[in-house]
């Protein structure tokens, strides 16, 4: 496995690769969710490149950029064990050669980015668009793998690829959960034992909503009440029912409904969702 830190080294590697390339962009602190993305890429491509880059432009002023976990040696060991070909670990100065005021500005499409996470974290998806498009430009992958847990991010990236005519297949991958059903996240390490137990209300709420849908309930208002009752001991930022354009729904639309939740257990903000 090669660990590349510079754009010039990555370009030199990529220039000599003619077969299919799978790409798994990450911010590190890898867990079994990331592992599932890497394993799928390894199955579907001749070469797999993973990036580890904590992207400063997607963090807000009061967010945890400096505190974000960075266990690089552990991440590299996992990638090598899995059989990754290249891990790209650039410095901020590599990815952003100009100061903020000198950069070309990229903006995520407002119709997908203004609500939900975009409303809670101003500029977050603009930062995601900045880094993902830069990485796509450098890696030029055949396929790129993203988890469904960050559903709004996934929809935005799918839109950007189509809108900018990029020849990249975006592969959505299922949410990976721990044995207690909590969706895997790098931020789960912040939870103490009590908070983790409280956080289990999030997958429980989604499970109960799914059960109600299976029993015939289609009214989003009623389903939301079911979910909020289970989430009552958490600080809920939102529990919303949308179609795949993130437009609010009143009635469940089969194969075109996303149920998204963001809530805090202690100080840790957690996301989860259900694709119906």
UniProtKB/Swiss-Prot annotation:
Pathways involved: Cofactor biosynthesis; (R)-pantothenate biosynthesis; (R)-pantothenate from (R)-pantoate and beta-alanine: step 1/1
**Keywords attached to this entry:** ATP-binding, Cytoplasm, Ligase, Nucleotide-binding, Pantothenate biosynthesis
Can you tell me which residues form the catalytic site?
Answer: 34 (proton donor)
Q: List residues binding beta-alanine.
A: 58
Record's keyword annotation contains Nucleotide-binding: yes
| A Gene Ontology molecular function term of the record | pantoate-beta-alanine ligase activity
- Cellular component terms, GO, for this chain's entry? cytosol
Residues the record lists as binding ATP: 27-34, 147-150, 176, 184-187
Q: What class of enzyme is it?
A: ligase
Indicate where this protein is primarily found: cytoplasm
The cross-references to InterPro entries, in alphabetical order and at most eight, read: Cyt_trans-like (IPR004821), Pantoate_ligase (IPR003721), Pantoate_ligase_C (IPR042176), Rossmann-like_a/b/a_fold (IPR014729)
Task: Report disulfide bridges, numbered on this chain.
Answer: none
| EC number(s) stated in the UniProt entry for this protein | 6.3.2.1
Intracellular or extracellular location(s) = Cytoplasm
Question: Is Nucleotide-binding there in the keyword field?
Answer: yes
How does the record describe its quaternary structure?
Answer: Homodimer.
Family membership, please give it.
Belongs to the pantothenate synthetase family.
Query: What more is known?
Result: The reaction proceeds by a bi uni uni bi ping pong mechanism.
> What NCBIfam families does the database record attribute to this sequence?
cyt_tran_rel (TIGR00125), panC (TIGR00018)
Q: What does this protein do?
A: Catalyzes the condensation of pantoate with beta-alanine in an ATP-dependent reaction via a pantoyl-adenylate intermediate.
| Name the UniProt record assigns to this protein | Pantothenate synthetase
- List the taxonomic lineage: Bacteria, Pseudomonadati, Campylobacterota, Epsilonproteobacteria, Campylobacterales
